């Protein structure tokens, strides 16, 4: 498994955008109705087997909401998990846990889902074949999606148009004759 690291700055800025998307303009109006804000402990438990990914995004999501939240990772990024595996334990004020839980779970689900699916293809293809991803990613999620492919054992192709030349059918068709 290749060692992949995303910068802390990238993870932080991505989590800030995600939280802003969820909380703008008025915050979590439902959680704000709760009177209780006691310290609580929550376990993140896998609901199926697969490859876990996105732990640093989940951790940073809670850290941005409350620096006092403890996020204890129980499984390594890129490791196999089974249904019922404890992935992480979160301890902190319940309101902040509730505010961040959906954003954190979305990162975990998306990255783990891609890594798990990629891993299935990699196993099926065998050692002599590389499973590569393309640039056909959701805008602004390319780095995360390609990261997930690597976690699953896949290979990244081009990240952008300047990485290498790629001549596809469009360039060899009549449409290309119109371009100087």
Description of each model-found segment:
Residues 174-180:
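Single conserved hydrophobic/aromatic residue that forms the stacking wall/gate
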Residues 2-173:
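Acidic/glycine-rich phosphate/pyrophosphate-binding loops and surrounding catalytic core
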